[in-house]
């Protein structure tokens, strides 16, 4: 086919087709049918324009090539065949000088006589199907469409064929000749079948036999065959259709399409009530680490050994006491539980050899904290089905909570940089293809921006805790196992570091189903005084357990060290997802990649390097009451990562519902900003669906508050 194209078409046309394919990254050695189609289309555009001029009186005249009057103004401006940038420049220039409406897609020609853009189509299928596809794609009454086929058929907007009979006959004859030449070389069948629909994703597979019969039988009423239905769908114009259908429905259905204007949306109503409280499985910005650098002790890497080594680095332990009680809990039991952990760790140190794992004694305080024997007894349904007043016990509605400032502070802190490196660059083999090289470059730049981020620390902490808890839940089902909360990182100088955040004690864990719950008690170190924001720590009992000497500008200062203790629970499926938290890195990298791709397609080259190395440029990060916040590309990477991490840490049905429902409103607002004149019905119902997800979850309430800021600034 390639040889045929080079013989059959003018070298200038072949060169333009080669350029066009290169611009779109297509290989003409492989896509030979496409190469032929582009050449054919170019030739038809040139033939359409040839010999047509406008004289001094503004009349259209036909002049042969050797005529001395060839200096007359060309009737048609050829846009097809130019590179994209030049083509758009020509289109913009025409629009500015003639007042024509700017088309959404690049047309092929401009007709100075009729003052309209023209889209030329050359099809190997039926002209009406291709015409409908073109019209459906362009969606503009201003652009004139003219379709030619290889069989001599043609179709044009409003049957206005623009050119005289003879000029069109020349084009049809040339197309018929190309078809004959291809057929004589055995190339026509392949060429005919290779035509794709206009900008559609699906291939037009030939459906035969049983599948074809089933397709024809499965159509809506009034359609005799699949092709008719396809043509109808391709040419379907949705405006006014929904209203028409609604009017045919039951009289009880009275949905009216209301125009959605800048004044239409109202802010989302956030609930009133006491401030929301912390509900993550482990402490975030308030966590304190006991650390060892360059660990080389015996048993290094065994969690219990590492934990004991970290505990030995602190010398300020003191008699613990409760500073912030848990309102509903038996606080002395939390205090006794911590004392028990200290005592049993001391027992281990006195032993000759430290064991790999530690099962706690089943004391009354731990049994209470872990809910041992608290579950209601299960009775077989057959034994009680005759009881007349058998019913499920009533459960209280959750109490509404209001947004509190601590969750925004948590998020801001998650976006910040720490002085440690939490992820290493993956060791991946040499790049083979150019695309791999670009992917590696993007990954390396992104990793450099987020490796020090606190959100990345949360990922590694979450992965470790969930992995350890799931392992213990399966390996020691009946035991109250002590699980150290550990993470590993590197200092800026590259030295390895092991960190201890506290401990978890796991309850009984016979987890048969994914949703079966294992209870655990978490005990976490902190320097945060809980009395500063008591509402945040509603679910915790907080002890003061020691004094820590900290270096400051005025020398060493002593600060009280606290232990945040609470009963919590999780399930197999939650732990499984917790172990997968590294996916957050991938999700945010993909979001950054789509930003790079958008920039690259505008500049027509890969912009990865410029994107990350142009430190002066700022990018939108998010909305706040002050307006659109902007920051460096590193800040954008870390903010996107923090959002993804918080979606994982604060995953809940409230978040699922809010994300799904608010997205609908977001799409309508974006359509309004794009001047697409959106319409809605039952907007009140959508607000209701969004607001019923705003109950007490801090992350959902913060997202709703951000959404309101977006609404305010988007509709100015």
From Swiss-Prot:
Cofactor(s) essential for the protein: Mn(2+)
Short sequence motif named Nuclear localization signal 2 (NLS2), residue ranges: 184-247
Residues the entry annotates as binding Mn(2+) 1: 41, 108, 119-120
Location(s), subcellular: Host cytoplasm; Host nucleus
Major enzyme class: hydrolase
UniProt cofactor note: Binds 2 manganese ions per subunit.
Example of a GO biological process term: viral translational frameshifting
Enzyme Commission no: 3.1.-.-
Binding site for Mn(2+) 2: 80, 108
Motif Nuclear localization signal 1 (NLS1) per UniProt: ranges: 124-139
Major localisation: host cell
GO cellular component annotations of the record: host cell cytoplasm; host cell nucleus
Protein's job: Plays an essential role in viral RNA transcription and replication by forming the heterotrimeric polymerase complex together with PB1 and PB2 subunits. The complex transcribes viral mRNAs by using a unique mechanism called cap-snatching. It consists in the hijacking and cleavage of host capped pre-mRNAs. These short capped RNAs are then used as primers for viral mRNAs. The PB2 subunit is responsible for the binding of the 5' cap of cellular pre-mRNAs which are subsequently cleaved after 10-13 nucleotides by the PA subunit that carries the endonuclease activity.
Protein family according to the UniProt entry: Belongs to the influenza viruses PA family.
Subunit structure: Influenza RNA polymerase is composed of three subunits: PB1, PB2 and PA. Interacts (via C-terminus) with PB1 (via N-terminus).
Protein name: Polymerase acidic protein
Organism: Influenza A virus (strain A/USA:Albany/12/1951 H1N1)
């Amino acid at each position: 086919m390639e040889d045929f194209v080079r013989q059959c078409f003018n070298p200038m046309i072949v060169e333009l087709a080669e350029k066009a394919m290169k611009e779109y990254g297509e290989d003409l050695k492989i896509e030979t049918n496409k190469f032929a189609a582009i050449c054919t289309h170019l030739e038809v555009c040139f033939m359409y324009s040839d010999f047509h001029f406008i004289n001094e009186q503004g009349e259209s005249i036909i002049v042969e090539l050797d005529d001395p009057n060839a200096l007359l103004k060309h009737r048609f401006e050829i846009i097809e065949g130019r590179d994209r940038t030049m083509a758009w420049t020509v289109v913009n220039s025409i629009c500015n000088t003639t007042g024509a409406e700017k088309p959404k897609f690049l047309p092929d020609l401009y007709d100075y006589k009729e003052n309209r853009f023209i889209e030329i189509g050359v099809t190997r299928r039926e002209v009406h199907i291709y015409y409908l596809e073109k019209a459906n794609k362009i969606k503009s009454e201003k652009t004139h469409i003219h379709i030619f086929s290889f069989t001599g058929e043609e179709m044009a907007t409003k049957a206005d064929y623009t050119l005289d009979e003879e000029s069109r006959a020349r084009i049809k004859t040339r197309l018929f000749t190309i078809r004959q030449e291809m057929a004589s070389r055995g190339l026509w069948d392949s060429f005919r079948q290779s035509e794709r629909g206009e900008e559609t994703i699906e291939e037009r597979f030939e459906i035969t036999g049983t599948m074809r019969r089933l397709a024809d039988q499965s159509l809506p009423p009034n359609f005799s065959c699949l092709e008719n239905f396809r043509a109808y769908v391709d040419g379907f114009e949705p405006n006014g259709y929904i209203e028409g259908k609604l009017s045919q429905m039951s009289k009880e259905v009275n949905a009216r399409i209301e125009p959605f204007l800048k004044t239409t949306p109202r802010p989302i109503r956030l609930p009133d009530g006491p401030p929301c409280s912390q509900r993550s499985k482990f402490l975030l910005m308030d966590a304190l680490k006991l650390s060892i650098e360059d660990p080389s002790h015996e048993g290094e890497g065994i969690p219990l050994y590492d934990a004991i080594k970290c505990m030995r680095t602190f010398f300020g332990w003191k008699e613990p006491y409760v500073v912030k009680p848990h309102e509903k809990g038996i606080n002395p039991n939390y205090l006794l539980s911590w004392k028990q952990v200290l005592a049993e760790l001391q027992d281990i140190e006195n032993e000759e050899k430290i064991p790999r794992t530690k099962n706690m004694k089943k004391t009354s305080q731990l049994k209470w904290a872990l809910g041992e024997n608290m579950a209601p007894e299960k009775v077989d349904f057959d034994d009680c089905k005759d009881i007349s007043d058998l019913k499920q016990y009533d459960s209280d509605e959750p109490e509404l909570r209001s947004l509190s400032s601590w969750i925004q502070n948590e998020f801001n802190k998650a976006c910040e940089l720490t002085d440690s490196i939490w992820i290493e660059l993956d060791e991946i083999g040499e790049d083979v293809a150019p695309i791999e090289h670009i992917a590696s470059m993007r990954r390396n730049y992104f990793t450099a921006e987020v490796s020090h981020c606190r959100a990345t620390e949360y990922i590694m902490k979450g992965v470790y805790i969930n992995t350890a808890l799931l392992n213990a839940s399966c390996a020691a089902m009946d035991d109250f196992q002590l699980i150290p909360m550990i993470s590993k990182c590197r200092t800026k100088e590259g030295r390895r570091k092991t960190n201890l955040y506290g401990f978890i004690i796991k309850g009984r864990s016979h987890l048969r189903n994914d949703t079966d719950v294992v209870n655990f008690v978490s005990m976490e170190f902190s320097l945060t005084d809980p009395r500063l924001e008591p509402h945040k720590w509603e679910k915790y009992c907080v002890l003061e357990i020691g004094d820590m000497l900290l270096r400051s500008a005025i020398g060493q200062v002593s600060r009280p060290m606290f232990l945040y203790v609470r009963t919590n629970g999780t399930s197999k499926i939650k732990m499984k997802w917790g172990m997968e938290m590294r996916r957050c890195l991938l999700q945010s990298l993909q979001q950054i990649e789509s930003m790079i791709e958008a920039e690259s397609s505008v500049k027509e080259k890969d912009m990865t390097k410029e994107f990350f190395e142009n430190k002066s440029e700022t990018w939108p990060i998010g909305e706040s009451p002050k307006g659109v916040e902007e920051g460096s590309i590193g800040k954008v990477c870390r903010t996107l990562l923090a959002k993804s991490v918080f979606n994982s840490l604060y995953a809940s049905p409230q978040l699922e519902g809010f994300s799904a429902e608010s997205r609908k409103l977001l799409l309508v607002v974006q359509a309004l900003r794009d001047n697409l004149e959106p319409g809605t019905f039952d907007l009140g119902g959508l607000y209701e669906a969004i607001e019923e997800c705003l109950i007490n979850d801090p992350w959902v309430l913060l997202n709703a508050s951000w959404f309101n800021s977006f609404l305010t600034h988007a509709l100015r």
